[in-house]
């Protein structure tokens, strides 16, 4: 299996289709395990311990850290520790939710590709499921994927509060966050540090066609695929039907999507978040290549970070140690993502046209679950609690969400 996985680690990657959610704010967290007073989230280190510019011991530790390699992914002892739990959980994934039937006070549900959003009056409840989405459809359910995505975002939300306030009120369950409602800007702030990608709207695709002004960014001649840009750039998109449409800052303002002041503030936040994320990723042997952010305005007028941040579903990560050598040789960067499973579906069916798709092999589902865990633990420097349970995840989520909402309504 290791050899099979290793041979498919780095196919040409198609950037994710970034999905928009309508949700909200908050400057503070509860415990990941259950809603405690609301403002405490002590699981993770302070932001300054993660910033590349921190001096002294943290910087020395960074310099001494061995380079991350594919061997760490394929032969890690940690992989052996979690594989059994992953396999035991293949039949207990969170594929669908129906909290309208199990949690009092919920009014409606919006089902997204991965997240289900419930209206709870003053709050929204966001459930991150284990669904794997690609080719504009769900391909499989991956054990612990929802938990890993949720806790990855929580970790980043917690450690970027010095840059921007965010949408989270509490996290009463490993798959759940509760947020206050706000008015969501219909723009996705895509930030890129490299010329890469293969979809119609990716930077390399449009650049290779001769485009030298993309979303208001002037691009010089002579760039090659996967090259690092002289500076990070913002390439916003807006939603039209089911696809992203690139848009320039002038078009955003002239089209009434945002005011100039709103766009300027959100842009500054997005670029600052990306720079911070690159520093954290570099510290842990990774390159944060590109990502997307979404923002909304709260009832008090503040611009808040919403949705998710720097997850493996919304971001592209490469291995830093081998990047330069592979770039010089014209090879694709080594990466850690879901592309190998996408490739399996493309080789075994037509995922765009076939009405019924084959079931993903259990060994590939297990491998992808491990990759999500690996990326979380690599970025955060801490182990995620992967707890096997016989209790259906939906029952646990319903119980914890009900208790959390009841506590919030009493505040």
From Swiss-Prot:
Pfam families the record matches: SAICAR_synt (PF01259)
Catalyzed reactions: 5-amino-1-(5-phospho-D-ribosyl)imidazole-4-carboxylate + L-aspartate + ATP = (2S)-2-[5-amino-1-(5-phospho-beta-D-ribosyl)imidazole-4-carboxamido]succinate + ADP + phosphate + 2 H(+)
Assigned EC number: 6.3.2.6
UniProt-listed PROSITE patterns: SAICAR_SYNTHETASE_1, SAICAR_SYNTHETASE_2
Record key words, sorted: ATP-binding, Chloroplast, Ligase, Nucleotide-binding, Plastid, Purine biosynthesis, Transit peptide
Name of the protein in its database record: Phosphoribosylaminoimidazole-succinocarboxamide synthase, chloroplastic
Cysteines joined through disulfide linkages: none
Domain of life: Eukaryota
Transit peptide, residues from-to: 1-53
Class of this enzyme: ligase
Xref: HAMAP family: SAICAR_synth (MF_00137)
Protein's UniProt keywords contain ATP-binding: yes
Similarity comment text for this entry: Belongs to the SAICAR synthetase family.
Gene Ontology cellular-component terms listed: chloroplast; chloroplast stroma
Gene Ontology molecular-function annotations: ATP binding; phosphoribosylaminoimidazolesuccinocarboxamide synthase activity
Subcellular localization, as worded in the UniProt entry: Plastid, Chloroplast
Pathway named in the protein's UniProt entry: Purine metabolism; IMP biosynthesis via de novo pathway; 5-amino-1-(5-phospho-D-ribosyl)imidazole-4-carboxamide from 5-amino-1-(5-phospho-D-ribosyl)imidazole-4-carboxylate: step 1/2
Organism: Arabidopsis thaliana (Mouse-ear cress)
């Amino acid at each position: 299996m290791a050899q099979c996985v290793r041979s498919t680690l780095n196919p040409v990657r198609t950037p994710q289709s970034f999905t928009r959610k309508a949700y909200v704010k908050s400057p503070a967290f509860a415990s990941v395990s259950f809603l405690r007073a609301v403002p405490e989230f002590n699981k993770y280190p302070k932001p300054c311990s993660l910033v590349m510019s921190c001096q002294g011991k943290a910087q020395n530790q960074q310099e001494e850290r061995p380079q991350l390699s594919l061997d760490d992914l394929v032969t890690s002892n940690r992989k052996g520790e979690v594989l059994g739990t992953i396999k035991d959980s293949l039949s207990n994934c969170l594929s669908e939710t129906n909290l309208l039937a199990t949690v009092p006070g919920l009014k409606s549900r919006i089902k997204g590709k991965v997240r289900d959003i419930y209206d709870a009056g003053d709050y929204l409840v966001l459930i991150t499921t284990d669904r794997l989405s690609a080719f504009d459809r769900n391909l499989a359910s991956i054990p612990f994927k929802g938990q890993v995505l949720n806790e990855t975002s929580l970790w980043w939300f917690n450690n970027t509060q010095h840059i921007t306030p965010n949408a989270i009120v509490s996290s009463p369950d490993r798959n759940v966050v509760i947020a206050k409602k706000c008015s969501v800007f219909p723009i996705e702030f895509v930030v890129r540090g490299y010329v890469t990608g293969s979809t119609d709207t990716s930077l390399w695709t449009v650049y290779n066609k001769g485009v030298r002004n993309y979303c208001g960014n002037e691009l010089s001649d002579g760039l090659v695929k996967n090259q690092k840009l002289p500076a990070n750039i913002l390439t916003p998109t807006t939603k039209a039907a089911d696809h992203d449409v690139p848009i320039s800052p002038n078009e955003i303002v002239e089209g009434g999507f945002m005011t100039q002041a709103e766009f300027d503030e959100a842009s500054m936040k997005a670029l600052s978040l990306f720079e911070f994320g690159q520093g954290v990723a570099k510290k842990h042997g990774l390159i944060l290549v590109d990502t997307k952010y979404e923002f909304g305005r709260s009832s008090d007028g503040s611009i808040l970070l919403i949705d998710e941040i720097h997850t493996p579903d919304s971001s592209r990560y490469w291995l830093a140690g081998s990047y330069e050598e592979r770039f010089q040789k014209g090879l694709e960067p080594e990466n850690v993502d879901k592309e190998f499973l996408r490739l399996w579906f493309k080789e075994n069916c037509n995922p765009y046209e076939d009405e019924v798709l084959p079931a993903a092999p259990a060994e590939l589902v297990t491998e992808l679950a491990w990759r999500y865990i690996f990326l979380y633990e690599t970025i955060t420097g801490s182990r995620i609690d992967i707890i096997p349970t016989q209790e259906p995840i939906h029952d646990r989520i319903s119980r914890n969400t009900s208790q959390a909402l009841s506590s919030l309504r009493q505040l």
